Amino acid sequence: YVEGIQDGIADSPEKMKRYLDTIHTKAEVIDDLVNNLSVFSKLELSRLTFEFKEGDINLFMRDFVDDYRLDLEKNSIKLETDIPTDEVIVRMDYEKMSRVFSNLIDNAVKYRSEDNPTLSVSTMCSDGGVYVNISDNGIGIEENELKNVFEGFYRVDSSRSIKGSGLGLGIAKQIVEKHGGKIWLKSDGLGKGTTAVVFLPKI
């Protein structure tokens, strides 16, 4: 596309915009891949440092979701939240867990339904910890693929037409496990949405 611009093939404003949009999209994919590869390799070699602090996960999630509201509105995605005001203290690295939840919300946005797209975020205390659920009503995942989604570079068949490195969930899993927690996905199948669940132990 760059060569096309240099060679004068983009001979109209509309074609130029199309070329530039494509270049921008591909650059974002490359940047995402390089960034994820860096984090993934550090995690694999146990070189990624963590700075754990005690904090209220409910307050953290309310603030975190608020930061996404404008982007969700721009994409005409309905946001539903059920995050109690009760204080729930966990020990976490705020930057690393922000990366985890960003990845999960970005996935929910990327794989959203074309018809009335909805994103739901909730927290619930049980089993000595807190469950954070991030759900969409999008393309869903077949049951036989759920066990593979956290492997590095794995892409489910239904998502391969959508840009992504296939590293995000693998990184999220390793980060959550460093917190003594667990992460998994649930789906009733293709076209029935997906729920990402993160469990973190309470203090």
Where are the language model's segments positioned?
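Conserved catalytic submotifs in the C-terminal HATPase_c
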Residues: 51-54, 73, 78-88
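Short conserved segment of the HATPase_c
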Residues: 141-153
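Conserved micro-motifs of the catalytic ATP-binding
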Residues: 45-50, 89-92
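Short helix-loop "hinge" at the ATP-lid/N-box region of the Bergerat-fold HATPase_c
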Residues: 108-109
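Short alpha-helical Gxxx[C/S/T] motif in the catalytic ATP-binding
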Residues: 168, 172
